[in-house]
Each structure stands twice: as C-alpha cells, then as structure tokens.
C-alpha cells in the first residue's frame, strides 16, 4: 500500500468465542458478484485527508462496494492484542480499548445497512508486527474474532460494540521470518466463522505483485483466501518487476497470479487489480505518478481481464486520494465503479447511481459501552500517541502529543512519528 503508515502497540491474549451477539447482519448486494470496487480507508498522508465520516463513502453513488479499515498495525512482538489507529480519531490501544471510536462504530452500521462490506485490515508497510509461534498466531486469531466478530464474548474489549466486521484483511508487507505462522491465524478465524452460520465472512489479502511474492507468498500457499487485492504498483525495481504495464512500467502479471494460486488452498480466490487512486497515491509524492492508471487506461486493463473466472474487480489505495482526484465530476472510486458497471469511465454527466437491492438491515446497532471505549491511561505528559505512531506531517490532523517518554520527530514533509 501507500508508504505512509503509522505504528502503535500490542497487549495480552484473546479468549474463547461465546454466544453470537446477534442472529443476523445481512449486507445488501450493491452490484453483481465478481465485479466489486474495494477502497482502503483509515490512513492519511501525501497531502490528502479523507472524510473522517466513513458513512460518507457508503452513499448510493459513492462507487464503493467494500471498505477496508486500515490498520491494526502492531501485534506479536511479545503481545497478542492487535492495536492501531483507524481514521483520524479511532485509536485502539495495546489493551484492546477503543478511544473515540463511537462515530466509526455508528458509520459501520450505516455502511453495512447500505450494502457495503466492512473489512478490518492487519499489517501495512511498517515493521511493528511479527509472529513467533503457531500458538501466538492462534491466540491473536481468536482475539480478533472475539473482539471484532459475532462472537458473543463479553470478557474482551469490543471497540465497535456489538457491531462486527464482514472479514479480515492481511496486508503483510514485512516478513521477518514469521510468514509461516499466519496460516494458523487464518485457520483460527475460519474455524470461528463456521460457528456463525447466519453470516458470511471474508479472508482477504493485499500481496505485492512480484512472484514469488516476498512477504505473503508463503501465507497464500498455505491458507484459504477469498479475495486477493494484488498491488500492481511500486514494484518496478523488484528482482522480477511488475506493474500495470502502462507508462513504460514493468509488465502486468495478472495471468501469473492465476497460475500461482491454482496450486494453493486459495485456488478459488478472486483476484482484484490493485491500483493507486491518484498520481500521488502510490508513494505520497509526484514520483508515484508513473504507477497511476488514468481512467481510460484502467478501463482498457479491466476490459481485457474482466471475463477471466478469477477476476474480482478493482482495489484502490485509498479513499482520500480518490476524493482528491476528480474528473468529469467523478472521484476515482466512481470512475472505477463506472468501468465495472458500464465498461467505460464516467461521462461528463457525473457518477453512475447505484441502486442496492432491498434486504434486511443489520441488527447490530449497539454503540460501545463505556467499558469498550474507555480511553487508555494518559501518560504523565497527557499524550496519547504511542511509540512509532504518527504525530504530524503535512495534511495530518490527528493527535500530536506522544506518550512519555517519546517525542514527535519529523521524518519528512508528510510524516512525523513518536520516537
């Protein structure tokens, strides 16, 4: 994904699943299966700031079918509770407590009621996560289910209250010798999915395009993924380079991906064409423009592969960059939707309108209790941003005070972190 990622901390172990929180959480279909538009939301940088109201991306004409919440970016390394900052305000601590997550919780319900799937992503391009053992991977997998799935578990923190996500995404961009353990985390999640027959959950991944894939290849070879959001950008200089095959870049290796997964447990996975949502999106700087596909270029690429049985749609990084990239009255997400639905970018009349089919709305509407959203204990300095967390940068509007004893250190125009 985009190179600007935050880092936070970790905590304790997960507990066993209990009675589901609710019997049913139906998600309305927004378009025919096999042609979905997936957008990452929750991280800012590169001079863009996304709308902090997630529900704004779930309007009928938003062009978005799946929203991936980014990221829980610290886990392992001695603790088994994933933590991170999602959006400009929702912080999930190393104890699993949610701080300022009420608005996001309400928006998740709104989006699911509108037919938009909500996926929670782990990882990112930082190096604050790793797995040391199979047991640890299984513990973290169980905790994720208990805290974010329809588990019925009331002994753990639930940052989104009784609402639960529609699946879990793995954007593992750091190997560290631990990739062989993720299969156990995914298997633990899937065993819990099976306990909730009223709902359907997804396991998704966002691998880099090179094959062999350096960080997620082993994971994909040993796990069952439903969606693969392949990042066809930022890999011109890899040993086996790959990209979208445009602008003089490396070749587009979509067919290599269908061949690769054919002999893995993920043989049935849908492959999504992962693209930057603006000329700045892939790197946060103008240098990333080489990886950007203009709407007409994207339409040509999709047109060539959309009939493939593995084709799943388009994935883009990210919501904020899409918002800043408007052509013919359409954001990049709306352009992608038009390409998937109509086979061409938006006309000058603006974005296509989605008309979701009628279906029961999710019943999980309870806001987090005071227990589940209690704030982490304040440090002596009153700061809330943990070690490695983002505390500044052009366009950043989140918290800026670091927990003691860390200080906010500038590392570039777009990024400062607590060190």
UniProtKB/Swiss-Prot annotation:
The keyword Flavoprotein does not apply. Residues 350-386 are annotated as: Disordered. GO terms for biological process: chitin catabolic process; polysaccharide catabolic process. It is an enzyme of class 3 (hydrolase). PROSITE patterns: CBM1_2 (PS51164), GH18_1 (PS01095), GH18_2 (PS51910). InterPro entries: CBD_sf, Cellulose-bd_dom_fun, Cts1-like, Glyco_hydro18_cat, Glyco_hydro_18_chit_AS, Glycoside_hydrolase_SF, Glycosyl_Hydrlase18_Chitinase. Keywords: Carbohydrate metabolism, Chitin degradation, Chitin-binding, Glycoprotein, Glycosidase, Hydrolase, Polysaccharide degradation, Secreted, Signal, Virulence. Pfam families: CBM_1, Glyco_hydro_18. Its EC number is 3.2.1.14. Transmembrane segments: none annotated. SMART domains: fCBD. CDD domains: GH18_hevamine_XipI_class_III. Residues 1-18 form the signal peptide. Residues 35-343 form the GH18 domain. One of its GO terms (molecular function) is chitin binding. Belongs to the glycosyl hydrolase 18 family. Chitinase class III subfamily. This is Endochitinase 2. The lineage of its organism: Eukaryota, Fungi, Dikarya, Ascomycota, Pezizomycotina.
């Amino acid at each position: 994904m985009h190179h600007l990622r935050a880092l936070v901390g970790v905590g304790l172990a997960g507990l066993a699943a209990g009675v589901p929180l609710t019997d049913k959480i139906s998600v309305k279909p927004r378009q025919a299966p096999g042609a979905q538009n997936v957008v990452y939301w929750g991280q800012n940088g590169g001079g863009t700031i996304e709308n902090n109201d997630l529900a704004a991306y779930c309007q009928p004409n938003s062009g978005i079918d799946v929203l991936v919440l980014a990221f829980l970016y610290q886990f392992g390394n001695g603790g088994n509770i994933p933590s991170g900052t999602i959006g400009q305000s929702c912080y999930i601590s190393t104890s699993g407590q949610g701080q300022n997550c009420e608005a996001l919780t309400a928006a998740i319900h709104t989006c699911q009621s509108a037919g938009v799937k909500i996926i929670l992503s782990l990882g990112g391009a930082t190096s604050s996560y790793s797995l040391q053992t199979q047991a640890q991977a299984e513990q973290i997998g169980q905790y994720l289910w208990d805290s974010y799935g329809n588990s019925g578990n009331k002994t753990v923190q639930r940052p989104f209250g009784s609402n639960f996500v529609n699946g879990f995404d793995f954007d593992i961009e750091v190997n560290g010798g631990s990739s062989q353990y993720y299969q156990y985390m995914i298997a633990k999640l899937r065993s819990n999915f099976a306990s909730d027959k009223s709902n359907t959950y997804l396991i998704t991944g966002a691998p880099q395009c090179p094959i062999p894939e350096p960080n997620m290849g082993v994971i994909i070879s040993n796990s069952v993924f439903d969606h693969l959001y392949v990042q066809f950008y930022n890999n011109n200089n890899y040993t086996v380079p790959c990209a979208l095959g445009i602008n003089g870049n490396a070749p587009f290796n979509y067919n290599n991906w269908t061949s690769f997964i054919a002999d893995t447990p993920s043989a049935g996975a849908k492959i999504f064409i992962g693209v930057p949502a603006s000329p700045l999106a892939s790197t946060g700087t103008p240098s990333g423009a080489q990886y950007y596909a203009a709407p007409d270029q994207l339409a040509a690429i999709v047109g060539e592969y959309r009939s493939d049985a593995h084709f799943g749609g388009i994935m883009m990084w990210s919501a904020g960059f899409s918002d800043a990239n408007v052509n013919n009255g359409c954001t990049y997400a709306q352009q992608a939707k038009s390409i998937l639905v109509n086979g061409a970018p938006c006309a000058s009349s603006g974005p296509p309108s989605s008309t979701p089919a009628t279906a029961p709305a999710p019943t999980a509407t309870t806001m987090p209790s005071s227990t589940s959203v209690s704030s982490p204990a304040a440090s002596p300095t009153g700061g809330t941003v943990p070690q490695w967390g983002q505390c500044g940068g052009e366009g950043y509007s989140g918290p800026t005070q670091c927990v003691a004893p860390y200080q906010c250190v500038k590392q570039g125009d777009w990024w400062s972190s607590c060190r």
